[in-house]
């Protein structure tokens, strides 16, 4: 053994507290490294699943409620232009719900369309089964978990009861999807 190896061995056996601190320090650092790499690999797939498989739209254009008919006609012309492959009008509303004891105040986005579904912009699915809006309200899985509701049960939002027809996969945010007919039945009015 060289002199440095002998000194190292002597110090390890002579100062047991330092030895234990070194061992636990190295073990803790390695554990943190593995935890960080594990979290990175778990989260790495979320953006592609959410924004390439589920929400496939490229842009959201909001119409000003106080826009004139001429402004609306101009917007319609732009949307029908050759640069736009497809578009779909939806009504979107942001709601807040407090899940006391679970996750606190959460923001929920309600999306309503006059079509049977939101494809090709949003793909609603549950275990590779495509979902449509013709059966009623579709909510996202995490929202269903927070609210403690399953298919066939009702979710109370803003004093309104929404009967859950389906639960869709989602990785970012909370969403409620419904058709125009469902919206009118629940709220008793057209979406403004």
Question: What label would you give each PLM region?
Answer:
Residues 58-65, 143-144, 165-168, 190-192:
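A short beta-strand structural signal in non-transmembrane regions
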Residues 62-78:
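Short extracytoplasmic
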Residues 22-32:
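Alpha-helical transmembrane segments of integral membrane proteins
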Residues 49-50, 73-151, 158-170, 185:
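Short beta-strand boundary microenvironments
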Residues 54, 168-192:
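Small-residue transmembrane helix packing/gating motifs
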Residues 10-15, 27, 112, 130-131:
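Helix-boundary and loop/linker segments of multi-pass membrane transporters
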Residues 1-24:
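Feature of multi-pass inner-membrane transport and sensor proteins
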Residues 30-57, 69:
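Alpha-helical transmembrane segments
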């Amino acid at each position: 053994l060289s002199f440095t190896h002998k000194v190292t061995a002597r110090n390890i056996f002579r100062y047991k507290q330092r030895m234990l601190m070194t061992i636990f320090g190295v073990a803790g650092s390695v554990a943190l490294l593995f935890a960080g790499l594990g979290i990175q690999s778990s989260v790495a797939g979320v953006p592609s699943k959410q924004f390439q498989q589920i929400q496939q739209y490229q842009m959201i254009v909001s119409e000003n409620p106080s826009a004139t008919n001429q402004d609306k006609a101009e917007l319609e012309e732009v949307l029908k232009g050759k640069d736009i492959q497809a578009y779909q009008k939806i009504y979107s509303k942001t709601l807040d719900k407090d899940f006391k004891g679970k996750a606190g105040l959460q923001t929920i986005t309600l999306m309503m369309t006059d079509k049977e579904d939101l494809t090709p912009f949003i793909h609603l699915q549950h275990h590779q089964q495509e979902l449509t809006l013709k059966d009623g309200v579709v909510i996202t899985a995490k929202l269903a978990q927070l609210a403690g509701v399953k298919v066939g049960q009702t979710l109370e939002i803003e004093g309104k009861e929404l009967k859950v027809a389906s639960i869709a996969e989602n990785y970012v945010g909370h969403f409620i999807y419904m058709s125009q007919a469902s919206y009118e039945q629940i709220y008793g009015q057209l979406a403004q």
